Regions:
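Acidic, surface-exposed loops and disordered segments
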Residues: 1-144
Length: 144
């Protein structure tokens, strides 16, 4: 990961994967999720077919599925980073890394999983530099 100090010096490193295969109807994951709702099999089949049709129309390739599932991992990432901050633990979401190289090192089956984001956790050594952020009114528009 280009020897980024956040990665080389952190105490814990979380690698979040996008589960490409799990969202496909034939994986069985989708069916298990619908069956948890304790509905008749005909209804389960109906929803699986509806889902499969949606997937075929909108997420027709593994690349499209990766793009969507990688975005979904942001929900987990945000929750982890917020929980860490509440506990006083620093973190940094990193998307800038050599994806293929890291996937190879991890030995991922790319038909099932792809690397989405890396999050180092720990405590900073130096004081944090001041943040030069845009004023809120320059980046957010409230619509009434």
């Amino acid at each position: 990961c280009w020897n980024q100090p956040q990665i080389t010096t952190c105490s814990h490193l979380v690698v979040i994967l996008a589960a490409i295969d799990a969202v496909k109807p034939e994986s069985g994951v989708v069916e298990r999720k619908f069956k948890r709702r304790e509905m008749p099999q005909e209804k389960v089949d109906f929803y699986i077919n509806l889902y499969a049709s949606h997937l075929a129309n909108t997420l027709s390739s593994d690349e499209n599925i990766y793009s969507w599932t990688a975005k979904q991992t942001g929900i987990a990432m945000g929750n982890m980073m917020t929980a860490a901050a509440i506990k006083g633990v620093d973190s940094c979401a990193i998307e800038g890394f050599e994806k293929e190289k890291v996937e190879e090192i991890l030995g991922l089956d790319l038909t099932k999983y792809r690397l989405s984001v890396i999050i180092p956790f720990g405590y900073r050594i130096n004081e944090q530099s001041s943040q030069l952020r845009e004023p809120l009114e320059n980046v957010v528009e409230f619509i009434k």
